[in-house]
From Swiss-Prot:
This is Centrosomal protein of 120 kDa. PROSITE patterns: C2 (PS50004). The gene is cep120. InterPro entries: C2_dom, C2_domain_sf, CEP120-like, DUF3668. Belongs to the CEP120 family. Residues 709-882 form a coiled coil. It is found in: Cytoplasm, Cytoskeleton, Microtubule organizing center, Centrosome. Keywords: Coiled coil, Cytoplasm, Cytoskeleton, Repeat. Plays a role in the microtubule-dependent coupling of the nucleus and the centrosome. Residues 1-112, 453-582 form the C2 domain. Residues 423-436 have a biased composition (Low complexity). One of its GO terms (cellular component) is cytoplasm. Residues 348-443 are annotated as: Disordered.
Amino acid sequence: MGYKSDQLLIVVSILEGRHFPKRSRHMLVIDAKFDGEQLSTDPVPHLEQPQFATELAWELDRKTLHQHRLQRTPIKLQCFALDTLTSAKESVGYVVLDLRAAQEKKQAPKWYSLLSSKYTKFKPEIQLNISLETDNKPAVDTFKAKEAPPRRSKVPGDLAGLEPKSLVPILNEAEGYHQIGPAEYCKDYFVLSVTIAFATQLEQLIPSTLRLPEPQPEFFFYYSLLGNDVTNEPFTDLINPEFEPERASVRIRSSKEVLCMYLSVQPKLQIHLCCGDQSLGSTDIALTGLLNKASVEIEHHPVVVEGAFILTPPNRAKQNLSAVPLEMSPTIGVSIALQKEIGLQSVHHPKEQPQSVAAEEVPTTPLKKSANLKEGARSPPPPKPLMFSDSPPTKDEATESEAESIKSDFQAEPPLSKPLTRSKSPPLSEPPLSGSHCPTPIQGVSAIAKNTSESSSAQKITVPPAAHHFCFTIDLRSIRNVDVGFPVNCILRYSYPFFGSAAPIMTNPPVEVQKNMEVFLPQSYCAFDFATLPHQIQDTFLRLPLLVELWHKDKMTKDLLIGVTKIQLSNVLSSEKTRFLGPHGDQCWRQTFSERITVTAVEGSKNKVAELSYIITLEDYGLVKVREVVVSESSQSTGQEKGSLPAQTLQSTAPLPEPRETLEYKAALELEMWKEMQEDLFVNQLKKKELVHMQALAEEWKRRDKEREALVKKKVAEYTVLEEQLQKALADLEKRERQLANDEMELKKLKAQMQLDCERSIQERQDSIRRVREDCMHQIELERSKAKQLEEDKLRLQQQVELERKLESTTKSKLHYKQQWGRALKELARLKQREQENAMARLKKQQQELEHMRLRYLAAEEKDVVKTERQELEEIRNELNR
């Protein structure tokens, strides 16, 4: 078994398919089974011509192959369609290959039709080839299935030996990311985020025997992301669950190839609905769709896997829940997104940023509890701001909650100083600050308090040394091609708390826009002054777009949200920089970007409803001069603000009044008199304005009253027409009722007649069934007798075939035995002759040895005789000498 020539490989090449239907949600997998060993191909897209390009191989020796060929062991290829969302596996068809067709020489591939195919209209086929190859490696076992060599991948040579199962995410707390793969090669940054947008029919998960905690149970969703436990905000109503869509994000430092390898071996993302420490239901979300898209599309845009997934109760609760239809099943809307960060690598390398440590410690950490977000909004930014935040949901119906989630996301990373807001068209709910148009905005920040008593308790904000003074302007210029089916009185609304104000900013007044018409928006220009770190504004603009809402203001009904659009503020960062001189002669930089974007509907198919043209500008005035500013808590009030006093003066106490003869007292008296005069003038102006506004209000009231009267008359006329129609319909109904009564009497008669006919036909059918049954029984008896006779013939023929096979085998064995017997006789005769020759040679040798021994014996005897005689002679000589 250890020789190379005895080891073979049965190789089944699965090349491609044809005549398959296209199913975007499914993948095709082929399982090949041979002698109890099963191999599978990689999942491929379910297209008309799927490309498998896979080889499956089994290792065995020639003796085992011969036995399998005698037994006609088949190779069965089963084709399955795998649902990427629910992981359901359904059979498409199968192919059976004959092992005897496998040859060691190369053969052309053939097309095989799928048997028992699910797609009966298409008749799908698979191109296959089966062959034998010599295995050059010594065999260890007699039979063992093994996988063919892996296909070539795009992983570089340095990572060729990297096993996907050995990849483990390592948390880098200092930089705020998870490292997957070797750090010297994996240097790209990715963001993996999971958003739970909505949930429905959750009450179906509560069995009748389950007792919920008192007095008011709280429910929440739980899942694990890269080893981090994530829960959303609890909610109490299962019938109408209301919770803000939340996004959990983790930053990953890896490469596209290594990240795909890591995702390929990860289990499905499991999301649980929990009450306390008990799981009421869960759903599994496969990451295969994300993996397939990430390998191709992630370089161009984020890849997303989203949908509504059905929650299934745990095994112990399934028996207590009744079956519900599909439309009543508990579902959860989830979106999983994987995005590659472009242009942020330089931000996270301290060597590339010549700034202080406080300015460099901005990278975000992985997941934390969402409750910490509120603390981060009140306190100065920590070295590692949180990245877990409420994000815009995937459903456009939750547009208002998108704005709130963006607001909370901004609060997670506040700017390093109190920003100023300046606007030529301020929002209705918040007046502009008096110091917003000042050329030195930082001094305006420090002089925002009303008086010295208020400034003593004002909040101090320390500006880091690396902070820059920025001015960001937004100009929503025009809107056109509004296509909603009716004229629109549109206003645009947006909010970006990072600029320092969470109040929404709106264009005013509303403008009427019709189809195929472009309108320039009034009071659409707004500017924001603030101080922050350069890389913090870059990171915020890249992560959070500006959400702009298109509203229709109707005088008679409630305001209607028509559509939304997102402005990518990061586009201004990539535009060309132009140099200009600031108000103090300093060198400043300006970046401007303009674009026309589409506004999509919030409901329905999310079609395009309008086009918006905008211009955004970012001005960098350089480093902030003032390192500590004082901001009053009432900085956004409508009262007058003293913007010229420094912070040190505001914190000092007022001096004691001097005698009346001093110039200061006279100046104060004149100032008070001037104030009273100005106050009287101001009151008169207010009264005049009030009169004008009251007249305008009266005219508007009269106009609207006339409109209401006309509308009421129109409605009365319409209702009169409807009343006539209803009376006519009532008469028709009475007529139809009488007709129905007559038809009912006729129907009863027909029913009785039909009953008689039915009974008669039933009797006739029973008689015919009895006759047919008797005929069938007789026919069955005949067929049974024929089958019995055929079975006997089959047994006889099988015995005859078996005897013939045994006779043939015996004849071959006898002939082989005779040949072996003749060879044995010849070998025996040759051995006997050789044995006789050897015996004769041994006999001669023994005779020679006996002769030599006899001669030696005789010589020894003669020697003894001579010795004896010598002794006797010696004795005689001795006697004679005596």
